[in-house]
Amino acid sequence: MGADESFGIPWVRLCPLWLIILGVHNILMTVRRMKTYAGSQGYVYQYYFVGKRPALASDPEAPATEFVFDVTSDRKLTYAVSVFLPEKAAEAWKATHGRALSDAEQYAAVKLRLFRAFDEIEQVRAHGRRLTVDAAWLEEALASLGVE
């Protein structure tokens, strides 16, 4: 086999195929944006949104939607923080406002709950890995954003 061939095919011919494979691979991979938040306790947190899923049926917060964030305050150890939005809180908001929450509104309330934990809990890793958005907090958070 020559220096410019691989498996009997000139390497130049494989290059476009590899570029296509890498391009498709990158499209299929989720790109997560690392964001920063300076908490009032003096810690600077970096976090990104991992995803959301229905809470497990055995979870004390169920039925709820679990929003998962990966968080670090030292850039060495990353840990998951789950923020639960119980169905009863979303239903209470719907009853008050006459419409269901959009996905963006749910995410906004959950993210504000995460920020509140960053501000109020000194060691989020030890004491703030499971957070809940109750009906009162949901109303307060969305009102602060002007959502009605």
Feature map (PLM): residue ranges:
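Short, low-complexity, charge-dense intrinsically disordered segments
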Residues: 1-17, 23
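Generic alpha-helical structural signal
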Residues: 18-19, 127
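Extended, alpha-helix-rich binding/interface surfaces that flank or overlap catalytic cores
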Residues: 25-148
